[in-house]
Amino acid sequence: MRKNEYVNLPVICLVGPTASGKSGLAVRVCRRLYVDEHPAEIINTDSMVVYRGMDIGTATPTLREQRTVVHHLVSILDVTVPSSLVLMQTLARDAVEDCLSRGVIPVLVGGSALYTKAIIDEMSIPPTDPEVRARWQEKLDAEGPRVLHDELARRDPKAAESILPGNGRRIVRALEVIDLTGSFTATIPDGTLHWPKTVQMGLELSRKDIDQRIADRVDQMWAYGFVDEVRSLANVGLREGLTASRALGYRQVLEYLNGDYDEDEARRRTIIGTRRFARKQLMWYRRDDRIEWFNALAPDLDDRVVARVLTALTTDEED
């Protein structure tokens, strides 16, 4: 893949925990840039927003927002299609190159720290095979993570030492890679940017504010008909979707629909799980000292972010 031929165009990356307001900020910033004659488009990097029909639970940009600013990688996959880190890396990088080739500023939004790094950093990702992963996933569901961890320890002791026995998802991935390549080596980016002129901006909030926003978002999800959305998706294969069925909120509502617990418990577990995920996001993002942090509640947030983009446009800086 060719690198950025438009050396004066930055690649913008907005990061931050769930419910911090990244998506709305991205739309507002792109609109401001357009007025200043600097066209910009949004590239989703969240592995769940790519699924069609998962609108309420993933806070997919509204149709009005998508008409206002061009969005890439939104609602492009059926819920039965597996997603993966390598797929998102490929799709997002292609979208960035498409923007740059047209003289458009790409604005990456969403996703976990791992997905962000896989896209903007030089990172080689081992291959994936849905059938191989499905086989190990079935074994995980039937026998639990410790049995698989024992298998991993037998086949690759070093890999087993690096993965906690209870982390079923990582164990499945490690066994998949071993089946495909013969060994597993955790890939950690060395900090070399794929596009040298990349600017990362993060939104920060207090834990109290994050927790409240998440509770409010989940309440809004339920008010907007989230349970009905999950029920409809279950009718078109959500339960069989290896990736989509694990999305926060969707997994909990599916378990409620299966009779595992009542609706109030599904709602409670969604809030708890989302808060836990947000804290994990922040922990990983804080490890990247290239991220410039902005107060998500600052009244001049939009002005400051736009100013930072304009500064990047007029300088030759490289992170």
Swiss-Prot record:
It comes from the Bacteria. It is an enzyme of class 2 (transferase). Transmembrane segments: none annotated. Its EC number is 2.5.1.75. One of its GO terms (biological process) is tRNA modification. It catalyses: adenosine(37) in tRNA + dimethylallyl diphosphate = N(6)-dimethylallyladenosine(37) in tRNA + diphosphate. Keywords: ATP-binding, Magnesium, Nucleotide-binding, Transferase, tRNA processing. Residues 46-49 are annotated as: Interaction with substrate tRNA. Its cofactor is Mg(2+). Pfam families: IPPT. The record marks S112, R133 as: Interaction with substrate tRNA. ATP binds at G16, P17, T18, A19, S20, G21, K22, S23. NCBIfam families: miaA. Catalyzes the transfer of a dimethylallyl group onto the adenine at position 37 in tRNAs that read codons beginning with uridine, leading to the formation of N6-(dimethylallyl)adenosine (i(6)A). This is tRNA dimethylallyltransferase. It comes from Cutibacterium acnes (strain DSM 16379 / KPA171202).
